[in-house]
């Protein structure tokens, strides 16, 4: 097979591992900088152009699109879909998962476990917003934040009100969520591929840090999932329409609660923690599905 990885940096661990795994399994793998692609939209023969010429026909693409370039990145993926190329994650599913609010609304509609969550832009009654999620301590998030940036823990209602007022001054959209104390600053990252959890790790926040992101000094270790946690992760991926994703879950007194679904999960932490060759599992899934044309929304929306 001929596979393209859409990535802005071929030296990133996840990109390198996917190239290695693809080549070891006998495939031709190219890394293409998403932002350097440009497209011929209106011709009867749609194409993606790169470095002054049309890209060759690929059997599959693996989008590794950063949050900051979601709009352009998904446009490139959509163009590949219009050309009949299989994408492990479709453009519409990536866009859906990048909208944190829409993701939460979709998962809530399906009855999946979520922390109590409020959404606001310029609330006229901040106290009522806090009361609706159970009061302090609360976690306040910028809707557009990634990797733990723009996430604040407010220990008291007074602190929470001050933070929300500051975000209001920035004209920002914010999420306010109940703080799950029993999680102890840890979460679980489940890697779902093809409707199955293929690997899982526990991420523990650094001392005194409630955010468990590895980018923020958190540590990763192997973990055994409960059947309910496994089901929750698989269902979250299904609701988002993602064939490959990282589902972040908190262990709470009310069962597993979903924090986020990531359409471009990093591989370094989970391969190190589990010892699994996750990259090869992803390529093998593509081998099984690329020619089935089983994607439901190809080239639409």
From Swiss-Prot:
Top enzyme class, one word, equals ligase
Q: What is its EC number?
A: 6.3.2.-
Look up the domain of life of the source: Bacteria
One annotated GO molecular function: ribosomal S6-glutamic acid ligase activity
Question: What residues does Mg(2+) 1 bind to?
Answer: 248, 260
Q: Its encoding gene is what?
A: rimK
Query: Which intervals hold domain ATP-grasp?
Result: 104-287
List ligand-binding residues for ATP: 141, 178-179, 187, 211-213
Its cellular-component GO annotations read:
cytoplasm
PANTHER family to which the protein is assigned, alphabetical: RIBOSOMAL PROTEIN BS6--L-GLUTAMATE LIGASE, RIBOSOMAL PROTEIN S6 MODIFICATION PROTEIN
One example of a Gene Ontology biological process annotation = protein modification process
| Textual note on the cofactor | Binds 2 magnesium or manganese ions per subunit.
Q: Where does Mn(2+) 2 bind?
A: 260, 262
Q: Which PROSITE patterns match?
A: ATP_GRASP
Q: What is this protein called?
A: Probable alpha-L-glutamate ligase
Question: Which HAMAP family does its entry note?
Answer: RimK (MF_01552)
Required co-factors: Mg(2+); Mn(2+)
Q: Which Pfam families match?
A: RimK, Rimk_N
Specify which residues bind Mn(2+) 1 according to the UniProt entry for this protein.
248, 260
Protein keywords: ATP-binding, Ligase, Magnesium, Manganese, Metal-binding, Nucleotide-binding, Protein biosynthesis
Q: Where does Mg(2+) 2 bind?
A: 260, 262
Q: Which family does it belong to?
A: Belongs to the RimK family.
């Amino acid at each position: 097979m001929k596979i393209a990885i859409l990535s802005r940096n071929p030296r990133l661990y996840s990109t390198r591992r996917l190239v290695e795994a693809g080549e070891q399994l006998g495939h031709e793998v190219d890394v293409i900088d998403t932002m350097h692609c440009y497209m011929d939209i209106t011709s009867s023969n749609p194409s993606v152009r790169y470095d002054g010429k049309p890209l060759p026909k690929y059997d599959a693409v693996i989008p590794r699109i950063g949050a900051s370039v979601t709009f352009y990145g998904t446009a490139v993926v959509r163009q590949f879909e219009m050309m009949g190329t299989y994408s492990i994650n479709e453009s519409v599913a990536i866009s859906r998962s990048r909208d944190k609010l829409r993701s939460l609304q979709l998962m809530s509609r399906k009855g999946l476990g979520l922390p109590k969550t409020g959404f606001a832009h310029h609330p006229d009654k901040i106290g009522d917003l806090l009361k609706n999620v159970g009061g302090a301590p609360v976690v306040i998030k910028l809707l557009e934040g990634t990797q733990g940036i723009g996430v604040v823990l407010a220990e008291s209602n007074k602190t929470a009100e001050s933070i929300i007022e500051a975000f209001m001054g920035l004209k920002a959209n914010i999420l306010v969520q109940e703080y799950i104390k029993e999680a102890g600053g840890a979460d679980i990252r489940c890697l779902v591929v093809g409707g199955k959890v293929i690997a899982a790790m526990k991420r523990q926040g650094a001392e005194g840090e409630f955010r468990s992101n590895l980018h923020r000094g958190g540590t990763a270790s192997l973990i055994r999932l409960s059947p309910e946690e496994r089901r929750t992760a698989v269902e979250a991926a299904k609701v988002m329409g993602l064939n490959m994703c990282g589902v972040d879950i908190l262990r709470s007194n009310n069962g597993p609660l979903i924090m986020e679904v990531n359409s471009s999960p990093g591989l370094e932490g989970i391969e190190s923690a589990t010892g699994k060759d996750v990259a090869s599992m992803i390529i093998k899934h593509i081998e099984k599905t690329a020619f089935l044309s089983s994607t439901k929304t190809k080239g639409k929306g």
